[in-house]
A protein has these predicted regions:
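Glycine-rich loop at the start of a catalytic domain that most often binds anionic cofactors/ligands
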Residues: 36-41
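N-terminal amphipathic, basic-rich helices that act as targeting or association modules
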Residues: 10-14, 20-22
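Conserved anion/nucleotide-ligand pocket segment
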Residues: 90-91, 95
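Short, small-residue-biased leader/transition segments that mark boundaries at the very start
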Residues: 2-7
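Non-transmembrane, aqueous-exposed alpha-helical and coiled segments at domain scale
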Residues: 42-43, 53-54, 58, 65-87, ...
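Duplex nucleic acid-engaging cores and interfaces of nucleic-acid transaction enzymes
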Residues: 31
């Protein structure tokens, strides 16, 4: 029950974002999720783990296809044994999301097997669709928001160096692409589920080139970052350490008291989220900022309870929300009331939705 409640809250939160995000296109937004109950241990048999996940995904996707109106010979056909209370509505498409990013071809195969009228236009992306990571479309859209925020502050992030902290790593779509959209990004700290990256005084040019190298390196992590390019006092540290040493340089850039010489990883991440930098770039998964009046239980992301901070504690001047649900809505309001500049996730990362809609429409036209 506990796990189910967590996923239920997460899906409902994503539904809210998706419905607003879909205002840029015609179809309304929806969201779904599934939790496999009998997954093998991936550390023991990764192939079996993936096969079970795909089998569950096939069940999950097949269900709405079976229940949705179809078009046959230009006429709407209602599925047998279905009692419906709405009008004809054969339009149903799916898009890759958390945990299913590489499953578009599987979904399209189901669509074709079931005779769904959209065929391989059913699931955007995949081998016959737009490659969102290759295009960098989600990050590019969010970066337009970032540029606007900087412009309102009288700065140009495309021609002037600026400091940044981030959530994610260079192997990721949104984080990786986002950290390559300006040659003037000085990434001073970042973290993912494995490592904490610290580079208190990075050279904008050489650090950009190194991030670009990691972006194209298969399955890269922060541990692959060339240590010789990290500025004095920085480094890459596993989150499994009991404590991480803090140099004077790191303390200075993150706004940590001089008396603090080391911190446990979770407390260091707290400091990164509150760093007095120009940009906070969220390209990760999870909810890291809430409002003072909200409890961690209300947020519904138990995995990050130990990391989460309040909106009023965030000292970055600008926030770019490449990832979904990185902040609660009340957390955004609290941050904005302190003078911070941000939009919302459904504004910043809506470009991917628009791209998928274009893809479906083009395929319908060609078919």
């Amino acid at each position: 029950r506990g796990l189910g409640d967590v996923y239920k809250r997460q899906v409902l939160g994503l539904v809210k974002a998706q419905m607003v995000k879909n205002t840029v296109i015609v179809p309304t937004g929806a969201k779904g999720g599934f939790v496999p109950q009998h997954l093998p241990d991936p550390a023991v048999d990764r192939a079996a783990w993936l096969a079970e996940g795909i089998a569950c995904y096939r069940i999950f996707v097949s269900s709405p296809v079976t229940l949705t109106d179809n078009i046959v010979g230009g006429e709407v056909v209602v599925p047998p044994n279905v009692v419906r209370y709405d009008d004809d509505d054969p339009y149903l498409v799916v898009a890759a999301d958390k945990g299913t990013a590489t499953f578009s071809d599987i979904a399209n195969a189901i669509s074709i097997e079931r005779g769904h009228w959209l065929g391989d236009a059913f699931a955007s992306g995949g081998s016959v669709g737009y490659d969102h990571k290759g295009m960098g479309i989600t990050a590019r859209g969010a970066w337009e928001s970032v540029k606007r925020h900087f412009t309102e502050l009288g700065r140009d992030c495309q021609s002037e160096d600026f400091t940044c902290v981030g959530i994610g790593d260079m192997a990721g779509d949104v984080f990786g692409n986002g950290m390559l959209l300006s040659r003037h990004t000085r990434l001073v700290a970042a973290f993912n589920h494995l490592h904490i990256f610290l580079d208190p005084f990075p050279d904008a040019a050489s650090s950009f080139d190194e991030r670009q190298r990691l972006f194209v390196l298969p399955r890269s992590s922060w541990a692959d970052y060339d240590a010789s390019l990290i500025s004095e006092g920085g480094g890459v540290y596993p989150r499994s350490l009991k404590a991480i040493p803090l140099s004077p340089e790191v303390r200075g850039v993150l706004g940590i008291a001089d008396t603090v010489t080391s911190l446990p990883p979770n407390e260091l991440i707290h400091a990164i989220l509150q760093a007095p930098v120009d940009l906070f770039w969220n390209g990760g998964i999870g909810t890291y900022v809430k409002a003072l009046g909200e409890t961690h239980a209300q947020v519904g992301d138990k995995a990050n309870d130990a990391l989460r901070v309040n909106g009023s504690q965030v000292r970055a001047k600008v926030v770019g929300e490449g990832g979904n649900l990185g902040w609660t809505q009340r957390g955004r309001v609290e941050y904005a009331l302190t003078g911070g500049r941000l939009n919302t996730d459904f504004i910043d990362n809506s470009a991917g939705v628009d791209t998928s809609d274009h893809e479906v429409n083009i395929k319908i036209l060609l078919d």
